[in-house]
């Protein structure tokens, strides 16, 4: 009621002693969070931020960070950026050319349905691109049914090459691959991971490009990237160059590593999940644990708790994006053996439930109560 507003008196020092001097509503919960963690987190931020704000900074200050991690003990507070490394991934600038969808996924079915219409809409604008072969069939859908997936990919690639990258819509994916075309990441050599795979072998590899559905805990990525020697050479040679279709290769040292990831666009709650050994793109924020006192399953539980979503919205960033530099500012409590055991068991159970289908709401309730009360002490 704006005619009878609440008046809350708060000393200016509260905001000056808060991380980033953020202005927050002085509710009972927020003031309790401030009392327990406000000055501690600000001191950590002031000391460490310039040393962890980029993956390059983390590498530059590697020895100091290792010594700091070794000094941590249960109950200590540390910024997530001091406990992990990682960052944004690859921006191909031409996903249609490089990215395919696994044939057994719902995304593949969507592509099978949309391809004829995409082709028809383009040819209506560019009738000179219609071939004699296409005219033999009653519809473009029937025409496409006569082609193999490799032939369809070649057709769409050639039309894009001739008429422009976005003729089917920016970022439209039209390639479908079988699982047998995807390489076993564990069998790849270091050279193949770094420089690409010969096309005489399966040369697609798993590709994590974010998750619009917002899955927590686990999701087997439905996408794969053509990691051929030719493609990798182009991506690396042209990274950062100006012009349409020029890629940006970020943080390649983290490619093919297991870790944690989330989409940078979220709704109300953060949704973190296990990242399999894959290439990750610019929309898939990824971090990798480097402190055995704070393992990834524990971090996974903390980020997936409702409290951390609330903390981010109140004290770090209240927009609809949660990027890597937001994550690096998260306060993480170094767990006791008992807390670590609880979170490890819960994370494994949640992942197992996710593999079977949906996760019961009781799992989230159990997690929220534990993180808020037992870990952060907000009773």
Walk through the language-model features, giving the residues of each.
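Non-catalytic, peripheral interaction segments enriched in hydrophobic/basic residues
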Residues: 340, 374-375
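Polynucleotide-recognition surfaces of large bacterial nucleic-acid defense/processing enzymes
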Residues: 1-218, 222-242, 249, 253-259, ...
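Short Pro/Gly-enriched beta-strand edge/turn motifs at strand-loop
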Residues: 242-244, 312
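Glycine-rich, charged/polar anion/phosphate-binding loops
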Residues: 245-247, 271-272
């Amino acid at each position: 009621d704006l005619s009878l507003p609440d008046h809350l008196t708060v000393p200016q020092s509260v905001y000056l002693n808060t991380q980033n001097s953020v202005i927050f509503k002085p509710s009972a919960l927020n003031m309790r969070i401030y009392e327990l963690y406000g000055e501690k987190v600000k001191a950590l931020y002031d000391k460490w931020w310039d040393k962890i704000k980029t993956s390059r900074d983390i590498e530059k200050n590697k020895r100091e960070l290792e010594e700091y991690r070794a000094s941590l003990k249960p109950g200590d507070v540390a910024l997530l950026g001091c406990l992990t490394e990682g960052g944004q991934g690859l921006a191909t600038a031409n996903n249609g050319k490089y990215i395919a969808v696994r044939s057994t996924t719902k995304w593949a079915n969507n592509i099978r349905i949309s391809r004829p219409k995409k082709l028809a809409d383009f040819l209506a604008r560019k009738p000179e691109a219609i071939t004699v072969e296409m005219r033999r069939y009653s519809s473009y859908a029937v025409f496409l049914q006569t082609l193999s997936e490799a032939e369809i990919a070649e057709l769409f690639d050639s039309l894009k090459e001739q008429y422009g990258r976005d003729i089917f819509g920016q970022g439209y994916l039209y390639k479908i691959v079988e699982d047998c075309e995807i390489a076993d990441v564990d069998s790849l050599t270091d050279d193949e991971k770094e420089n690409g795979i010969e096309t005489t072998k399966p040369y697609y590899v798993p590709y994590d490009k974010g998750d619009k559905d917002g899955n927590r805990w686990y999701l087997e990525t439905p996408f794969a990237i053509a990691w051929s020697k030719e493609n990798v050479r182009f991506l690396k040679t042209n990274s950062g160059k100006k012009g349409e279709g020029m890629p940006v290769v970020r943080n390649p040292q983290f490619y093919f590593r297991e870790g944690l990831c989330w989409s940078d666009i979220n709704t109300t709650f953060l949704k973190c999940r296990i990242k399999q050994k894959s290439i990750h793109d610019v929309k898939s924020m990824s971090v990798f644990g480097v402190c055995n006192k704070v393992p990834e399953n524990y971090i996974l539980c903390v980020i997936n708790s409702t409290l951390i979503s609330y903390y981010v919205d109140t004290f770090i960033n209240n927009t609809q994006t949660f990027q890597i530099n937001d994550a690096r500012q998260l306060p993480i409590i170094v767990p006791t053996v008992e807390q670590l055991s609880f979170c490890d068991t819960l994370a494994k159970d949640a992942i197992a439930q996710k593999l079977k289908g949906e996760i019961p709401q009781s799992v989230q309730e159990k997690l929220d109560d534990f993180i808020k009360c037992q870990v952060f002490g907000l009773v």
